[in-house]
Structure formats: C-alpha cells, structure tokens
C-alpha cells in the first residue's frame, strides 16, 4: 500500500548522531512531540537555571549544562553543552527537534543518551530520523536514499553525485519524465470520454514522438548508470599474467605495503588477494591473481580458476608481460581471454614489466598478441616495478580512461542506485510496448495501460505507491542517528 502521513509515529526518538568514537564534539539528537519537554528536564542555562525550551526562538542554540537529578533532588552537572532547538516543521525530520552538542567521549555521549531515554524518549532505529523526514514530506525517497549514499561516499565523484541527488537532481528528472507521461494519459482518457472535444486524429504519430523522446532520455540515464556505478563504487581491477611476471610486485607497489609474497619461484601466488587503492584519482579494487597457466597442481588449479573469474568480473584488466623473457603460449592464451572481455566493453592496460633489464620482447611482438587475432591492441606502457618507471604514466592513463576530471565538470545525472536503475529500465520497456502498439495500429486504450505502468514505476523512485516493507528495508541500511 502507499505510504501516507498517517504512518508518522507520535513517539519521541533519540540517538547519538555522530560517530561512535572519541572526538571533540558529539551530538545527541531528539525528535518528536516531547523533544522540548525532554530537553527542558535535562538542560540548565549558563546560570544553571531551568528553562522552557519550547519558548525559545526556533533555530536558537545556547550554552548551558546537562544535569542529572539524584534521589535527594540534587542536580549534578554531567557536561557543558550547546543545545539547539528547531520547531516543526522546520527541522530535519519535520518534527520538534532538540540537539545536544556535548564533548565527544563515548562514555559521556552514552551517559547523556541514557538520561534522554530515561526522560521519555525511545531509542531510534537505524535511519529513523531520515525516515521521518520522508514520511513528513520534506524529502522524497530518492533524496532520502542520497543521505546514506553521501555518508558512505568514498571519492569525489560519489560525493558529488550523492549531493546532487540529495538536492533533487534525480527527482527533478524523474518528475519531468512522469509529467510528460501523465499528459499523454490524461489526453487519451479525455479523448475517450469526450470525443467531440478531443480529437485523436494524428495522435498516434504525436504520441510516438513523445515515446521516442522518453525512451532516449531513459536510455541516457541507463547508459550512464554503469559508468556511475564504476566511478562511485570503484573499479574492479584484475592483475593478470603468466606466473612470475610481477603481478604481486605491482600490488605491493600500488598499495605501498608488502601485501603479497614475492619470490622468483613460479606459482607462489595460489589464491586471489584483494586491496583497494587510489590511482590517478580513481578508486581501484585490485585483485592479485595466480599466474594463468596449465598446471597439474590441484591447489594451483583452484588459484588459476579464481584468476579467470576475477578477469571475467573486472571493469579494468592490468595485463602484465615480462620483458626479460620471450613471449610464451601462456601470454597468447591470456590475450585471447582478454579479447573476449574487450568485446564486452572491459578496459585493459598492458604493462610490459622489468624495463630496467635487458629486453627480449619488442613492443611490436606484444601488440601482435592482439593484432594477429584481428583486435586493436589496448594501451601499452613499459614499466619497472623495481625503479617505479612507468607508474606515473599508469596513473595518468587510468584517470584519462575513466575521465573523472571531465565527469566532475559535467552536470549530468547519474543513477547510482540499483533500485532506481531497475525502475527506469522497467519504465523504458513499457514505453517500448507503447511504441509497438502504435506501430501495430492498436486502439488508443491499449496505449494507456503501458503508459500507466511507466508512470507508476517511475513513481516508486520518489516513494509514491511503494510498500511499507520496501521503505523499512531501505531505511534499515542507515546508521543509527541518521
């Protein structure tokens, strides 16, 4: 069923809104009809006098003390605080809200939270403050989800796209598309109900133009969704090559730590090893893999299989070739696997390692691994993991490959939420069905069915006509205090 304001809870909730660690400042947030009363019970002015917080001018923050009253009626100061008061509906949750800014010790914050709960508040559930903002109508569901995305962002692209979504960029685009769909639905219904005043002559052609526009806009959103996912979550990067070409050395070099064992013995790496690093401003989820080759060793076979899986799932492949050894059949077999991935849009960079040693491999020979199979050779860089030669060029090329600087300057809308992507995809498919109905010469009432579905599905992104269970599941991912 659709959510309404009737679902708003009347009890008052509280939680620590800052990180659960020692810091200069910690915040205890209280929201609900009893927020001011609870705050007034515990807060004393700078002169240690009682005050009715509800009489303060909304948006006020004042210095004072949080006190605990013992059994004899004596008030003991717990901490000096700054207390802010926000009157409904002009608060984060749209409810009366009190925030206690205290010193950020974990014991101290929990102690004050205990007093707040003892004064009548209930412990908030994860994401409940933002959920109340959604139920109160201050933000739609897409903007509510952006709050958690912003908190969990790990790079500038993720921060920027989350901030744009929080400000309503995604919501505005979805409303624009829904508005065009609703206009067509209303016109068809009016024409069917009142044919004397609404003519359908030539209408299918005009509707087709609208559908083609809608399909293009949705396709644009979907095409940028995968790009957005990669840049937001990081690039799944597989380091592949035959045994002992320097894969583990590359992982160690990029992480700045001795994460992988490096020896001259082939097959040292028996399993995949993952680390996350930033290269060229891009977050790479690196996977060091076992050398891909035919082997009778059962344990190494498992490692080779996992290496092949990492290659299959990668957004970026770093293919290492040893310049101090001649190319082998193993190099050729790996190139064949990479070509299959290139055909599916995966990126690849070839790193010809050990350039500080006498080379037995030419650039043309490496390129021939791909050219001889009718495929253009990916970017090729010479490097030395002993001297660091070529690593700067690698960073620059990764940044260029994923053009993060270019994207950062654009105001494009990116769907970074899988739920949103699935909804747009379903809506796009419904629009295609309308196009098919027009081409088949079907009557106008058939158009409305699929138009209505597209309108409804896009509405779920905003939180319209969504089930309670979905809302509960979304907000359960949030942290306490948000």
What spans do the regions from the language model cover?
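Inter-motif core of Ras-like GTPase G domains
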Residues: 300-324
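Switch I (G2) and immediately adjacent beta-strands of P-loop GTPase domains
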Residues: 62-79, 83-87, 267-295, 313-316
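A glycine-rich (often HGG/GG-containing) alpha/beta subdomain
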Residues: 1-160, 164, 168, 341-342, ...
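Glycine-rich, N-terminal phosphate-binding loop of Rossmann-like dinucleotide-binding domains
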Residues: 30, 102-104, 254, 289, ...
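Generic enzyme active-site microenvironment
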Residues: 286, 320, 351
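Conserved G/P- and acidic residue-centered "switch" motifs that form tight phosphate/ATP-binding loops
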Residues: 137, 244, 288
């Amino acid at each position: 069923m659709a959510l309404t304001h009737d679902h708003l809870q009347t009890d008052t909730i509280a939680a620590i809104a800052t990180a659960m660690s020692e810091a200069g400042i910690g915040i205890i947030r209280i929201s609900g009809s009893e927020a001011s009363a609870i705050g007034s019970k515990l807060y004393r002015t700078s002169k240690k006098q009682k005050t009715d917080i509800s009489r303060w001018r909304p948006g006020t923050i004042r210095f004072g003390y949080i006190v605990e009253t013992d059994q004899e009626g004596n008030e003991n100061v717990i901490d000096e605080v700054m207390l802010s008061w926000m009157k409904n509906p002009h608060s984060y949750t749209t409810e009366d809200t009190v925030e206690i800014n205290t010193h950020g010790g974990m014991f101290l914050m929990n102690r004050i939270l205990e007093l707040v709960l003892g004064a009548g508040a209930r412990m908030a559930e994860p994401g409940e403050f933002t959920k109340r903002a959604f139920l109160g109508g201050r933000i739609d569901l897409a903007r509510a989800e952006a709050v958690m995305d912003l908190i969990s962002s790990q790079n500038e692209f993720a921060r920027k796209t989350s901030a744009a979504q929080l400000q309503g960029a995604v919501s505005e685009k979805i409303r624009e598309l829904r508005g065009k769909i609703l206009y067509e639905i209303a016109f068809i219904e009016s024409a069917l109900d009142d044919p004397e005043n609404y003519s359908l002559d030539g209408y299918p052609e005009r509707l087709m133009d609208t559908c083609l526009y809608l399909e293009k806009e949705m396709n644009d959103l979907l095409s940028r969704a995968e790009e957005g996912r990669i840049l937001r979550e990081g690039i799944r990067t597989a380091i592949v090559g035959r045994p002992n070409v320097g894969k583990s050395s590359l992982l160690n070099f990029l992480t700045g730590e001795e994460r992988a064992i490096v020896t001259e013995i082939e097959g040292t790496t028996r399993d995949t090893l993952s680390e996350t690093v930033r290269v060229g401003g891009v977050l790479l989820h690196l996977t060091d893999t076992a050398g891909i080759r035919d082997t009778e060793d059962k344990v190494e076979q498992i490692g080779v299989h996992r290496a092949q899986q990492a290659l299959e799932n990668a957004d970026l492949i770093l293919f290492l070739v040893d310049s101090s050894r001649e190319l082998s059949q193993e190099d050729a077999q790996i190139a064949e696997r990479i070509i299959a991935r290139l055909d599916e849009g995966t990126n690849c960079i070839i790193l010809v390692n050990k350039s500080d040693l006498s080379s037995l491999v030419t650039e043309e020979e490496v390129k021939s691994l791909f050219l001889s199979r009718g495929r253009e050779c990916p970017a090729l860089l010479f490097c030395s993991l002993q001297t660091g030669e070529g690593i700067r060029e690698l960073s620059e090329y990764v940044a260029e490959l994923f053009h993060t600087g270019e994207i950062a300057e654009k105001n494009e809308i990116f769907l970074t939420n899988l739920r949103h992507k699935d909804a747009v995809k379903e809506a796009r498919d419904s629009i295609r069905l309308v196009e098919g109905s027009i081409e088949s010469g079907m009557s106008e009432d058939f158009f409305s069915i699929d138009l209505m579905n597209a309108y409804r599905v896009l509405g779920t992104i905003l939180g319209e006509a969504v089930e309670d269970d979905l809302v509960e599941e979304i907000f359960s991912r949030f942290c306490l205090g948000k």
